Amino acid sequence: DFYQNVLLPPREAFQGSILFYEVCGCPDGETYAARMKKMAEHGFFDGIAGLLLGKPLGGRRAAALYDRITLQVLAELGLSHIPVVSNATFGHNSPAGIIPIGAMAELDGDNGRFSILEAAVE
């Protein structure tokens, strides 16, 4: 099971963190919803400060679909309190932004903003 992979950090590492997830690898909304539910089952959303979703392939229609599914699944799981910013440009899309893992960041779900608050390198 991928979600129990020893290469992934322990779930405690996610406490207070912003979880970023690249949705471009999901072939359809049904698969995406199933993956989100599986991630929740394995504790990925426990105690996170926010969820940052990458821009899906398929343009605005795909983005609207994944937004709707995300909010629906979070509501079903009793996780509507988690702020979400979607359609972010990181990972395997264009333009490809880089997110420095471990850097202090801020996610504002109400205004759709994600900000990195400190230098990624010294």
Predicted regions located by residue number:
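C-terminal active-site/capping subdomain that shapes the small-molecule cofactor and substrate pocket
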Residues: 27-122
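Accessory alpha-helical/coil subdomains and C-terminal extensions
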Residues: 1-28
